[in-house]
Every structure is written in C-alpha cells, then in structure tokens.
Regions:
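Bacterial N-terminal signal peptides that target proteins for export
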Residues: 1-8
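Active-site SXXK
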Residues: 36-43, 56, 62, 87-119, ...
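Short, surface-exposed beta-strand/loop micro-motifs that present aromatic residues
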Residues: 371-373, 378-387
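Short, well-ordered beta-strand elements
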Residues: 382-384, 389-398
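Boundary of Sec targeting at the N-terminus
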Residues: 22-24
Length: 419
C-alpha cells in the first residue's frame, strides 16, 4: 500500500496533464548543489558541440528530485529542447515488450519454458552455425542441430542463439549482415520467418548474446493475443499509463516538430545503420528497437515498475513477476555464460529484459545492488534503484556519447545522495 500511495502522489504531482515541476523536491534526499554538476556537464558538452540537447527526470520517493531540458531539440532549425520532446528510444523498447509478454505469462497464455516453435513453427527447423577451419585455411560454417529448443525465456534474456549482425566478425554475423533481414517493408510475421531461416550464433540457452530476440518475442505476443504488437501494448500498457506519445511511429503530423534530432555528424547507431525517420510508418513494429517516447511517458512506465506493478490503482504486473524480471537469469547457476560482446558490463547480470546489478563494486559507475537498467542506441538510458526508491530517465539523440553519459550520470546522481 505504501508503494501505491507513493505512486498516486507521483502521478498527481508529476504527470497530470504532462506537466512536471522543474524545482527539486526538498524531501528527496538529493543535494541540489551536487545535482548542479549534471547541469554543468551537459551544458559544457552542448557549448562544445558534442551533443545537441537532452532531458532528464530523476524521481525519488515518488516525487521529482530534478528535471531539466537543455540545448536544442533539432540542431538543424535551432528549435530549443522541450520537456515533451519525442525521442527514438531504440532498445528501451525491449523492456516494454518484455513486460507485455510477462502479462501473458501471468494469464497462463504463455510459458517461459515453452519452445518458441510452438508459436512460430518455422523455428522448429532452425540450425546452429559452428565455425571450423577448412582445408584451405579459410573459415567454414557448418550447420548443426540445436541440443535443446529455443524457449520464451531465452528470447527474454538474450540466450536464444539469435544475434545481431553488427557485433564482431563471425561467419554467422556475416550471414545476418548479408541477408539484409531488415530491408524492405514487412511485418513481424515476415520478420520472424526471415530470421528463422538464419543460423544461430550459439546453442540455445548457453550464451548471452545481444540480439533480435525481443523482435521475435513481439511476434509471439501477436500470435498469442491475436492482435498486432502495438495494439496489444497500447491496450494493456500505453493507454492505461497515459503514455500518449509512445508508439512505433509518429503518424500525427502535429507532433512532428517535437521529434528530437541528432547532430548531422552523429547519426550512426551501428554498423551500416543510421537514425530512422519515425515520420515514415512501416509495417514492422520492432519490439526490440522501434519505439519513440518522451521522458514523461517513460517515467510513467518506470514508476509502475518501481511501484511493484500497480500505479493509480491499475494493476499491470505482479510484484513476483517484476522480481523475476529484475533478478539475474544468467551465470553458472543457469548454465549461461556472457558472450564476447556483453553489453550489461562488469558487475551486472541480466534478467528478463533488464540488466541487473549484482555487485556494489566491479562496475565503473556508482549504484546499488539490485538496480536495473537498459539503454537505447540513440543515446537514451534509464535505471531503477529499488533500494533507494529512485529512478532516472535520460534522453538525448547522440549515439557516440551514450556510454560515457550512462556512467557519468550514475556517478553524479549517486554523488548527490545525502541519505
């Protein structure tokens, strides 16, 4: 009940009508003079032309401790950054999709242990790519059967064996790159069919490897719910939370001026990939990286998670589901090893849709054991700290600076804690 009351206070004070007061709350336990270091850090980068602009919202004990918008929303027309700016959140779509899938798990319509092929039959024939040296010394890719089926849990924790094509130079990744699976206009059903024809990079359930797994999970949601991914998420998550500006594309032209843009020399989000235009709708609703949102919208989502799955007396998820999602699901006990491109970083494990901090040290940033986070390729990031009853959502469109900011923001926010 205490967490629900905090959530109600948060909703009333912070997000009614989309307005959030910018002044720090005196009871937040965060020192204003220390939080000012964030101002200095961001404004210095803006002055140097390193980032165009950014927004941040820090909430503690259900109240805004700090909120700012700096710089320019669109550097091409010098439009100032605003609180309601719309950002491409890329992989911050993944937690929303995973929450949607967990709703189906709670209803008994989906099981973590179930094979993906139960819902997408094409995955019954998937193969695993294994490299070896050929007679001429060249690398050769052999295809072998999986030792165990790919499961729904594997999709949620990135242990499916599916991969992305932009990390490393393995032969499987080359197959992904050469197949151009994201080219053209297609829906989630066709995407799942395309990716099921490609070899897996690892045996399912053995290795954490960042991937299109959440995109496939989005298709599973469609099959189980008999609705499009967006229709299901809109009905069950976005509309009840009041996330009016969160979607896969911005179809409403009146919102187009609010879309945040990167600097012209900072548009690359990966190998041979640049910022997409959310004004141009496609049939693909990428549950792994296709959404746009605002800081205020995403704050509603995070407050729901921090409030144990209930916000404004509306129940979304059980506290037990959130506990499972934010507990480590990899490591020796699970028989899962981190792959060579382990994005959660040192000191972190991975749950279902979230990286989870396991150690007070090891990681290069300050924080709490049990905090969970994820980020987007375009420069957005968030984390939730249940121990400190705190969450942070930071949004910018600057992929080149995203890792530096993720670490620096942690250090400055926790450096401001006084109790």
């Amino acid at each position: 009940m205490k967490s629900i009351n905090r959530a109600l206070v948060a909703a009333a004070l912070l997000w009614a009508g989309g307005a959030i007061a910018e002044d720090q709350d005196a009871g937040s336990g965060l020192l204003p003079r220390a939080l000012a270091h964030i101002d200095d850090y961001v404004t210095a980068d803006i002055a140097k032309g390193v980032v165009p602009g950014a927004t941040i919202t820090i909430v503690r004990h259900g109240k805004v401790a700090y909120r700012r918008a700096w710089g320019e929303r669109d550097p091409t027309n010098r439009a100032p950054m605003t609180d309601d700016a719309i950002f491409r959140i890329y992989s911050m779509s993944k937690p929303i999709t995973t929450v949607a899938a967990m709703m189906l798990v709670e209803e008994g319509r989906l099981g973590l242990q179930e094979p993906v092929a139960k819902y997408i039959p094409q995955f019954a024939n998937v193969k695993v790519g294994v490299e070896r040296n050929g007679d001429n010394g060249q690398r050769v890719l052999d295809l072998v059967d999986p030792r165990q089926p790919m499961t729904i849990q594997d999709l949620m924790r990135h242990t499916s064996g599916i991969t992305y094509g932009f990390f490393g130079d393995s032969l499987v990744r080359k197959v992904y790159t050469d197949s151009h699976i994201t080219r053209g206009d297609f829906d989630n059903a066709e995407f799942a069919d395309r990716i099921a024809k490609l070899p897996l990079a690892y045996q399912p359930g053995t290795t954490w490897d960042y991937s299109h797994s959440t995109d496939v999970l989005g298709r599973v949601i469609e099959v189980v719910s008999a609705k499009s991914l967006y229709a299901f998420e809109k009905e069950r998550i976005l509309d009840p939370l009041g996330m009016r500006d969160t979607s896969f594309y911005v179809k409403d032209q009146s919102k187009w001026p609010r879309i945040a843009e990167p600097l012209v020399n900072d548009r690359a989000i990966g190998r041979d990939a640049e910022f997409g235009d959310p004004r141009v709708p496609r049939r693909w609703e990428s549950g792994g990286g296709g959404m746009v949102s605002t800081a205020a919208d995403y704050a509603r989502f995070l407050q729901m998670l921090l409030s144990s799955g209930t916000l404004d007396e509306h129940h979304y998820l059980s506290p037990k589901s959130i506990a499972a999602m934010t507990s480590n699901q990899i490591g020796p006990a699970a028989g899962v090893v981190p792959g060579p491109f382990y994005l959660p970083g040192p000191g972190f494990g991975f749950g279902l849709g979230f990286a989870v901090r396991l150690e007070p040290g090891v990681a290069p940033q300050l924080g709490s054991v049990g905090e969970y986070f994820w980020s987007g390729a375009g420069g957005t990031t968030f984390w939730v700290d249940p121990k400190e009853d705190l969450f942070v959502v930071f949004m910018m469109q600057s992929p080149a600076q995203r890792l530096r900011y993720r670490i620096a923001l942690h250090n400055m926010v926790y450096g401001a804690l006084k109790n």
